[in-house]
Curated annotation (Swiss-Prot):
InterPro entries: Herpes_UL87_C (IPR004285). Coiled coil: none annotated. Residues 102-125 are annotated as: Disordered. This is Gene 24 protein. Residues 104-119 have a biased composition (Basic and acidic residues). Belongs to the herpesviridae UL87 family. It holds the Pfam family Herpes_UL87. The gene is 24. It comes from the Viruses.
Length: 768
């Protein structure tokens, strides 16, 4: 052992790693062993070096000093320590010399020095196999990196791939290693490290830190496996939790505090809605006003029935059910029979209703019963005896557990091995990320099918939800203003131009108290939906909007660059024709794809990853057909224009670009110049211009008559509709319908197509 300069013990040292061979750890493990001193102060000091790159004093380190050091950016520093812990230990070859200059790398570790106090300034090395190569030399003057050393001693260090490492350019190494004095005195204790991490990160932040780091090193399989193994080493002590201890009986005050905490925690998880605020306040008041009722409800087994005589229980339950639709509460007007979690509510006039709460949700039933208590309410006590404050003793509890074991299900061959194996993939899948909002409100989904770009546009969404209205809303001035039921109990229908959406309001006999159902049809992203809900409050007395559910998605795509567009509807066994709509419908796995003219499709019912998979399975057979003629340059041009403008290309824009491309090809010019212009934004457009919009409100700027003339052109004193052959018709599709009188020009076009597509297309064009 030697005592280098004191600078080594104040800051963490970043070392270059030249040898990434897997045998490095084996060379050390075969020859020597390091003592596992699990002192908390040393573990805190190691964590500080990994997070802050500096020591807190070794054995004098404590949690207060660590809190003060991490206070500026606790999440950033802790995540840096987590990433280094995931990379694992690195045994760094070293030669330590004493003050007289004698090398210590060739000697065994002094057993007496290993038992010294960890606070002294001595570096503990671990003996191993002989090593020759790049390594570290520590002398009384400092530390040096040498490309050629001979040693069999190793330092305990930690790998690091941080971009914030103060690495020198002349090192030219991929990885680094972090070393501090405490690492030479003890091994890393994963359990203590996880406890320190939990002090600054939640479990969700810890999982997110791990997932983002693993995705960054996904290409290196060995490194990813090492990170996953160290991740489960940090969580290893959680696989076999300690058995629960028998809790002694608590006093009535402590029991009431525990029960009240459970109710308040459940109420705190409710959605933050204005309509639930009075109910929250009433529950908090009744926790203090009715302690005996709370104790009786908590002592009642869940299989027993609760009887109440209170007003307003039905309204409270309907309000909470709308706010939390995933917790289903069944309501009956007749006795449903023996079911657990039942509540019988008797209101004025002798009206009785039975409520059956979901299993293992006793706190839900207790909370709603407590909310109904008031001056005139009364809780009918059950026949179950109230437990005493003392409770059963430990011998009675053990006998009860043994008796319950007699009737437990017997072991089978599948469950005979204990403890059950833990499947690591079930806890965490780094490659999967759930993005429900981004998938539900994605305006454009781009994918590549065998190198062919396709953009899928979200046409519209049908959203169902409930709203609670202000009872002081507008009154009807006359009897004639009262809305009449029209279609499917729709009493009102609103159409809004900006943002474009429609709202249908359904009939409800208690719209102010229990809410009414609405149906919203909207297209756009999540911000457009929030904007639409804000506009809804301008013409309706909306007090609360309850959780929504998207009932249907409609998406549209165009196969840009497919020259023979009739291929999508010909010669397919999975396509049948509809009678009332001009489209061919392909149905697979319960979802329909309607193919219109000019290779345009509409998909319903699916979104997100399901939509991408459905489009891929539908378009792959078409694009891989031997008869398909694909123009990848056109596909790149139109995909670029669609991606830049986040909208489908309309008829006039489509025909202009098609003719521009064919003119360049006809003149034997560089057709990729059109692609470069598209990428430069020269063909960008707005959905609000008259030639692209479908909204009459926007077309009315120039007048209705001019709006109708937009999709038509004057050809030989005759009006011709541009979209007659389809909005997405390409040059090959509309070529046969133009230039009937100019035979010379048409023959030149046919020769051009034969030159670009092949001689087999000449006969095909003459037939058309």
């Amino acid at each position: 052992m030697a005592s280098p300069s004191s600078l080594l013990f104040g800051e963490a040292v970043i070392l270059p790693v030249y040898d990434l061979d897997a045998q490095q750890q084996q060379r050390c493990a075969k020859g020597g062993r390091m003592e596992a001193r699990e002192l908390l102060s040393l573990q805190i000091d190691i964590f500080s070096c990994l997070a802050l790159n500096r020591s807190l004093g070794g054995v004098t380190a404590n949690l207060d000093a660590l809190d003060a050091a991490l206070r500026p950016e606790p999440i950033f520093y802790t995540c840096r320590a987590v990433r280094r812990l995931l990379l694992g230990a690195c045994w760094y070859p070293v030669v330590v010399e004493n003050e007289e200059g004698e090398g210590e790398g060739e000697r065994e570790v002094d057993e007496a020095a290993a038992k010294e106090e960890p606070g002294n300034n001595r570096i503990g090395t671990v003996p191993g196999e002989a090593y020759e190569g790049a390594g570290l030399i520590i002398t009384s003057d400092g530390m040096y990196i040498n490309k050629k050393i001979q040693t069999h001693s190793y330092l305990h260090t930690i790998y690091s791939l941080e971009s914030t490492d103060n690495a020198r350019e002349e090192w030219r190494c991929r990885a680094r290693a972090v070393f501090c004095h405490s690492l030479s005195l003890t091994l890393i204790n994963p359990q203590l490290m996880f406890r320190i991490i939990s002090r600054y990160l939640s479990i969700n932040q810890f999982e997110e830190c791990f997932s983002s780091f693993v995705e960054g090193v996904a290409r290196d399989r060995a490194l990813r496996a090492t990170c996953t193994r160290n991740y489960f080493a940090l969580l290893g002590h959680l696989k076999s939790p300690a058995p629960p201890l028998y809790s002694p009986p608590a006093s009535s005050a402590r029991a009431h505090e525990l029960h009240a905490h459970g109710v308040l925690s459940f109420v705190a998880d409710w959605p933050d809605l204005e309509a639930l605020a009075p109910l929250r306040a009433k529950i908090a008041e009744n926790l203090v006003a009715f302690p005996q009722t709370l104790a009786s409800l908590c002592a009642l087994p869940y299989c027993r029935e609760v009887s109440l005589e209170a007003e307003g229980f039905h309204e409270n339950q309907a309000l909470v059910s709308m706010a939390m639709p995933y917790l289903k509460v069944a309501v009956y007007k007749k006795d449903p029979g023996a079911r657990p979690g039942r509540v019988v509510a008797r209101e004025g006039g002798g009206v009785e209703r039975w409520y059956v709460y979901p299993p293992r949700m006793a706190v839900y039933r207790i909370t709603m019963c407590l909310a109904a208590m008031g001056p005139g309410a009364r809780h009918v006590p059950s026949e179950a005896p109230r437990p005493s404050s003392e409770g059963p003793g430990l011998p009675h509890a053990l006998v009860s557990l043994l008796n319950r074991g007699k009737y437990a299900p017997r072991e089978t061959r599948a469950t005979m091995t204990l403890p059950l194996g833990l499947r690591e993939g079930a806890l965490f899948e780094p490659g999967e990320r759930r993005r429900p909002l981004a998938d539900s409100f994605a305006p454009v989904s781009s994918l590549s099918v065998h190198g062919f770009g396709i953009n899928v546009f979200n046409t519209n969404m049908v959203i169902n939800t409930k709203i609670a209205c202000d009872p002081r809303g507008a009154r009807y001035r006359t009897v004639m203003d009262i809305p009449r039921l029209t279609n499917n109990f729709v009493i009102r229908k609103y159409s809004v131009k900006e943002p474009s959406f429609t709202v249908s309001v359904f009939y409800s006999d208690a719209a102010c108290a229990s809410g009414t159902a609405i149906n919203m049809n909207i297209s756009g992203d999540y911000l457009s939906f929030l904007y639409a809900v804000g506009n809804l409050k301008c013409f309706m007395p909306v007090r609360t909007v309850f959780p929504i559910s998207v009932a249907n998605w409609n998406s549209t795509l165009d196969l840009q660059g497919l020259e023979n567009q009739q291929l999508v509807r010909r010669g397919r066994s999975d396509v049948f024709w509809t009678t009332n709509f001009p489209s061919a419908v392909s149905t697979q796995r319960g979802s329909n794809v309607s193919w219109f003219k000019a290779a345009t499709a509409t998909i319903s019912k699916v979104h997100g990853p399901g939509l991408v998979a459905r489009v891929y399975s539908e378009t792959a057979p078409i694009l891989t057909n031997p008869r398909a003629r694909l123009n990848l340059v056109k596909n790149a041009i139109f995909s670029t224009v669609e991606t830049r403008n986040k909208a489908q290309i309309q008829t006039i824009h489509k025909r202009f670009l098609e003719c521009l491309y064919e003119c360049a090809s006809f003149g034997r010019l560089d057709v990729r110049a059109v692609l470069r212009l598209a990428r430069g934004g020269y063909f960008d457009f707005s959905k609000r211009i008259i030639s692209h919009t479908k909204n009459k409100h926007e077309c009315a700027v120039l007048g209705y008559k001019k709006c109708n003339l937009i999709p038509k052109i004057l050809c030989d004193k005759k009006k011709v509709r541009l979209d007659e052959l389809g909005r997405n018709a390409n040059f090959m599709t509309f070529l046969s319908s133009v230039a009937h009188r100019n035979r010379k020009l048409k023959n030149r076009m046919l020769r051009h197509i034969s030159r670009t597509m092949g001689l087999s297309w000449k006969l095909h064009l003459h037939k058309n």
